[in-house]
């Protein structure tokens, strides 16, 4: 295992695979804040050269956190399909990149070997790819999951309807839900981030969602994105629930900062399979985002792309229905501007797909970041080309509760029309039956939620 190279007369030596991974990363303010990123473009290129020559066995044998010290590492390593791994262990990272991008390599081929990849391998190959490489490679990979409906089918583009409200007012939430449905949003999930994180409030909102879903016979899923334990208590108290949500991290310490461990998630999954209202078998919803581990001092010297890949390795253990990165949510301290947000969104989507999970993206930014709505629309268009499973839908793209900017209801509808994609089939049929969509386009009824009042 060689950790040095010479470029144009200068020799670059790296102390560990963890350092190589960090310095091979594209520029991110989060890595610079942590003191991990390359100091110069030349050092970044040198790290990429060294990384390209490492074997997949090198990466498996040197996880960024030791097996004995981190639960996430143990899950990733123990879940590995040894037969798939043995078939590729001698490949270099460069070999893996060339194979994924080869015209002769199919999505089915990639899915077959993906169970033999650790998260460090996934992150490593991502770092050697251009933005177009990430789009091209991700578009090959189809990952589906089933809750009440099936997400990720070829030819579909889904949307989470996110009716957040500053006071959790049921009527305000309902107004956003009905408007979003009329625009074709909500086939991925109708999911609210509550202001009040209590089992009582979770149950109250879930019952309202269930009332709307049952009255109009809407083929979708419902979820309230409170802490996992609050949702579990609400379900035990009798609340209807299709999906249990939790934000996750790429290290045991990061998950502890979020207030849970793997046993908590396993318990939540079992609870919903036995007491939830969904068909299943995929009944979990996870959100991630580059930089979350650094924000809780849980990165242990690893870069944010590698940490993000480890989130996906952790997630796939629990067979989720939805996973999405909230790509610009933490702010410019981690992703400085539109260029970094765009890169991170493409990286996260590719790494999620390569890890074998049904991947979506919250294309978003904070108000103090050097990005605007045009940048987010650009990212959504690129991710649609990459085969992203779903986006967010918030009234006018302005989340007045979480105080950040993301995609609105119209963006997903426009991208569906541009690319010839539809909502999930059962939901698309419902939209047509209700008169909101005709011949693949929104009708004049779109945007008028009053037609769904009852």
Question: Can you say where each PLM-predicted feature lies in the sequence?
Answer:
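Alpha-helix-loop-beta-strand connector modules within alpha/beta enzyme cores
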Residues: 133-141, 145-146, 153-159, 199-227, ...
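N-terminal small/glycine-rich loop or linker at the start of catalytic domains
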Residues: 64-72, 141-165, 283-296, 359-361
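Long, compositionally biased, glycine/small-hydrophobic-enriched stretches that function as flexible linkers
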Residues: 1-142
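Hydrophobic faces of well-ordered beta-strands that scaffold small-molecule active sites
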Residues: 155-164, 188-190, 218-226, 243-246, ...
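Glycine-rich, proline-tolerant flexible connector loops at the mouths of alpha/beta enzymes
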Residues: 113-118, 122-130, 189-207, 325-339, ...
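Phosphate/diphosphate-binding glycine-rich loops and adjacent basic-rich segments that engage nucleotide
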Residues: 236-298
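Active-site mouth loops of central-metabolism enzymes
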Residues: 84, 157-172, 294-304, 365-374
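Conserved, mostly hydrophobic/aromatic
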Residues: 180, 383
């Amino acid at each position: 295992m060689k950790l040095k190279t010479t470029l144009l007369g200068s020799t670059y030596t790296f102390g560990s695979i963890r350092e190589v991974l960090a310095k091979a990363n594209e520029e991110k303010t989060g890595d610079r804040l942590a003191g991990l990123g390359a100091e110069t473009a030349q050092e970044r290129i040198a790290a990429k050269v060294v990384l390209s020559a490492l074997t997949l066995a090198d990466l498996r044998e040197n996880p960024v956190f030791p097996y004995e010290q981190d639960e996430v590492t143990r899950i990733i390593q123990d879940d590995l399909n040894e037969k798939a791994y043995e078939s590729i262990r001698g490949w270099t990272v460069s070999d893996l990149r060339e194979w994924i991008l080869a015209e002769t390599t199919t999505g089915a081929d990639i899915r077959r070997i993906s169970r033999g990849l650790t998260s460090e391998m996934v992150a490593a190959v991502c770092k050697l790819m251009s933005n177009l490489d990430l789009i091209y490679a991700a578009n090959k990979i189809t990952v589906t999951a089933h809750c009440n409906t099936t997400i990720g089918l070829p030819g579909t583009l889904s949307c989470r309807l996110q009716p957040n409200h500053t006071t959790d007012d049921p009527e305000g939430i309902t107004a956003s839900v009905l408007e979003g449905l009329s625009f074709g949003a909500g086939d991925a999930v109708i999911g609210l981030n509550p202001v009040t994180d209590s089992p009582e409030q979770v149950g109250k909102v879930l019952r309202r969602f269930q009332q709307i879903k049952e009255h109009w016979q809407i083929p979708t899923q419902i979820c309230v994105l409170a802490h996992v334990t609050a949702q579990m208590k609400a379900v035990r108290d009798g609340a209807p629930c299709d999906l249990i949500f939790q934000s996750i991290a790429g290290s045991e310490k990061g998950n502890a900062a979020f207030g849970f461990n793997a046993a908590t998630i396993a318990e939540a999954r079992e609870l919903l399979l036995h007491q939830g209202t969904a068909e299943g078998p995929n009944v979990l919803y996870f959100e991630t985002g580059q930089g979350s581990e650094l924000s809780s001092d849980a990165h242990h010297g690893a870069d944010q792309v590698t940490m993000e890949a480890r989130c996906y390795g952790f997630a796939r253990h629990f067979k989720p229905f939805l996973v999405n990165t909230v790509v610009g949510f933490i702010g410019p301290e981690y992703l400085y501007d539109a260029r970094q947000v765009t890169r991170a969104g493409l990286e996260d989507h590719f790494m999620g797909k390569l890890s074998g999970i049904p991947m979506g993206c919250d294309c978003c930014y904070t108000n103090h970041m050097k990005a605007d709505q045009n940048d987010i629309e650009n990212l959504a268009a690129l991710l649609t080309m990459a085969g992203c499973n779903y986006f967010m839908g918030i009234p006018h793209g302005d989340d007045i509760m979480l105080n950040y900017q993301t995609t609105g209801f119209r963006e997903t509808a426009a991208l569906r029309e541009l690319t010839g994609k539809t909502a999930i089939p059962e939901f698309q049929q419902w939209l047509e039956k209700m008169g909101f969509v005709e011949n693949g386009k929104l009708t004049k009824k779109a945007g008028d939620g009053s037609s769904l009042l009852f």
